[in-house]
Curated annotation (Swiss-Prot):
Region (Disordered), start-end ranges: 93-154
Lineage of producing organism: Eukaryota, Fungi, Dikarya, Ascomycota, Pezizomycotina
Disruption phenotype: Results in cell wall fragility and leads to delayed conidial germination. Also leads to high sensitivities to heat and UV-B stress. Impairs appressorium formation, affects growth of in insecta produced hyphal bodies, and alters the surface properties of conidia and hyphal bodies, resulting in defects in the ability of the mutant strains to evade insect immune responses.
Family: Belongs to the chitin synthase family. Class III subfamily.
E.C. designation(s): 2.4.1.16
Statement: the UniProt record of this protein carries the keyword Cell membrane: yes
Keywords from the UniProt entry: Cell membrane, Cell wall biogenesis/degradation, Glycoprotein, Glycosyltransferase, Membrane, Transferase, Transmembrane, Transmembrane helix, Virulence
Chain's role: Polymerizes chitin, a structural polymer of the cell wall and septum, by transferring the sugar moiety of UDP-GlcNAc to the non-reducing end of the growing chitin polymer. Contributes to the production of conidia and the ability of fungal conidia to germinate. Involved in the fungal cell wall integrity and the ability of conidia to withstand biophysical pressure. Required for appressorium formation and evasion of insect cellular and/or humoral defenses, promoting the fungal dimorphic transition to the production of hyphal bodies that occurs within hosts, and ultimately to virulence.
Gene name of this polypeptide: ChsIII
Protein name: Chitin synthase III
One of the protein's GO biological processes: chitin biosynthetic process
Membrane as UniProt keyword: yes
Lipid bilayer topology: Multi-pass membrane protein
Amino acid sequence: MNTGDTPCKTSLRVTTWVDRSLHHLKLQTEFCMNMANRSHSQYHITPQDHDEDARGYLLNEPPAHGYDHDRLGVGTPPDRPVSAYSLTESYAPNASQLPPAGSGGFGDNGFGQYGQPQGFGGPYDRPLSAVHDEEESWMQRQQQPGGVGQAGGLRRYNTRKVKLVQGSVLSIDYPVPSAIKNAVQPRYRDVEGGNEEFMKMRYTAATCDPNDFTLKNGYDLRPRMYNRHTELLIAITYYNEDKVLLSRTLHGVMQNIRDIVNLKKSTFWNKGGPAWQKIVVCLVFDGIEKADKNTLDVLATVGVYQDGVIKKDVDGKETVAHIFEYTSQLSVTPSQQLIRPTGDSPQNLPPVQFIFCLKQKNSKKINSHRWLFNAFGRILNPEVTILIDAGTKPSPRSLLALWEGFYNDKDLGGACGEIHAMLGKGGKKLFNPLVAVQNFEYKISNILDKPLESSFGYVSVLPGAFSAYRFRAIMGRPLEQYFHGDHTLSKILGKKGIDGMNIFKKNMFLAEDRILCFELVAKAGQKWHLTYIKAAKGETDVPEGAAEFISQRRRWLNGSFAASLYSLMHFGRLYKSGHNIVRMFFLHIQVIYNVLNVIFSWFSLASYYLTTTVIMDLVGTPVVASSSAAEHHGWPFGDTATPIINALLKYLYLAFVILQFILALGNRPKGSKFTYIASFMVFGLIQGYILVLSGYLVARAFQQPISEQIKLDSSEDFVRSFFSGSSAGGVILIALITIYGLYFVASFLYLDPWHMFHSFPYYMLLMSTYINILMVYAFNNWHDVSWGTKGSDKAEALPSANVTKSEKNEVVVEEIEKEQEDIDSQFEQTVRRALAPFKEVEEIEKKDVEDSYKSFRTGLVVSWLFSNILLVVIITSDNFNSFGIGKSASVRTANFFKFLLYATAALSIVRFIGFLWFLGKTGLMCCFARR
């Protein structure tokens, strides 16, 4: 048989870990002949009639003739050729290709629907559709089988006794489903035949603080156990993102690892062992309570997680983190397609070493980083650690570009890539002004801000969503200072921890990544610097609603402001570093630049208001011709109406600024969503009006030829006329060039100008809201620092690991040992859930009672305050002269005081009459009262 380079060759390789019978080889050969002419598309192939065997294999359903009984257990499928079959067809709910429930070889073994044991006392004794609550369904799946089933009947499982490491550390290897281990390419199984890396998943219940997760205490990780050098540790931090966001990040990371493994001319990766063995991917989930349980199904499909494994405590000692380890070649795309290897194609994903850390309680992102650096980092000792937030999608070869920055610069301590907003298919999200504004903000930061700071050698913030650090550079003081913000260390650190911090320091740790950046550059005796790497790109979601946008920026603005002051106050520590005189010179320039930025930020509220009013006055106030000024008429509504409209807009501007203070001091953004949307609209309309007036002002300034305004006779005349002449031409030219021109020039030089056309107009309209709404809310909520650990009711219902003594007086845990067919059957359920089409649940905001009370209070205060302000303005302002309520402000003031005096007198007379009536009535009653 000569089929060329087909999957048949791969399937017929003799593996070292199993002895296949000749009968199986014959079946595989026949199957391969049918598969030889099929397309090798990686993602999807329309199922044909002869795909039935492949579909049955992927579903772990044996053929009618059954399988030989080998050491992998009854019903284990033979090693089939790897196809490009899309498991969405097989596992999607109500798929037409599915066989009837209970059919196949498993039905002969007493298995009922979906191949589950009859009478099984767990969540599988009824269809999952009956379990409406996702959380409840997940909790049921964690219970240990083997007891009396709720449906009646008794299912007995074999048990095994697992010895605890050093008498206290529970670490167990669990067999993975057949479909997962059979998906691994034989060439990797051959190489790794001496261990169980692809055969079993390792689970460790960590009952200690991250600082105590050490070899000395009995904890270990597979890459070190296999004596592998970890060059690159890629960390994905997760909070509550859905399975699409997690898959987007995870699949992007695996594709980037493939880029590294496929390097042909590398002088590093192709030496000293396979490249994939030098890379570890670590997922850290911040608590069971907040995690989307569908993401756990995705990880279980990849092989990194299994239901029914985790233990809430070991011998009464609470588990702090559940750690899973497995090496997999599987991935799930954001569109819920399962990616498997196809033959020996270079497009196959290489094996990826996974560490999945599921923290039992929510204890914030900084604690997740403590698990990463202090626990896993100290054991693996990587050269470079890359940090990625779940939801951020790294572009092709981006992780390689980040690593190359460290490889080519021995003094590089940290780096970040370009983060840009996810704009949706065809850029449809740009129709949302908030998304467009943030897109422009990200772009300009990547084009102007990051390159400038990178030139100085100190990037003020390496965003945690997409950045990298040299591990040995941040060890020591940088990490120690960084982790002072971890509230789980408050008891250990005492006054140096969160409990001993003032409100300024607590806000500083809202942007703790800025603290790490400064501490890294200022590290004593070292000359580490930070840089921006243009070739590394990451795509992330941005808030699309006003409430979410405001809440996000509160933390960013307060944290960055406090951290900026921290770096300025501690600038003297740079003199203890090892930077040379040239670097120190540029760092001094940078600190002056940062001081000016802080000052301008502090006075930005007044600056925006003064700019608005000055432009209105320049354009709207009519000017009579004189020897020093030309005649100007009020524009655009004429000499009479323009000043009145401008005055109303000024008052409206002030009113909405005051409204922001009232909202910020008492209301949640989600509780006042529509008020904030109205505020964005009002400030946007006023800013649009100002832009129109500015355009008119520019046109009016250049009515006089520029040659007459700016003298070119000599350099002295040019400087005098340009900067201090009576005309405004020079000043306007400076403004146009620095505000608009530089953005366009820099964007075109960067070869990325498109944001200037689709996002810049939105930014021009809403730029005042960054101060009037975002900064006002942030500063008014300076006290809002949320740190507390949130406990988990879900964790309380998890099973425990009860310790006993063996015959040899060893500390052991008795663990249920499932048969392979049970594992495969439950895996079928898992993949069904993982590959089901994602349906985004629209969050229905229900205003709670407290929000309704706060909204009423806000309305009451606003009505009271603004009505009083309106009265004062009407009485004292000359802008209301033409409304027929008085010839001038002085006349209205006099009339108001007359009215006030007469009204006060009248009310006093009424009170006096009432007094006389009461007095007379009391006297008369005294005379006629009975004694």
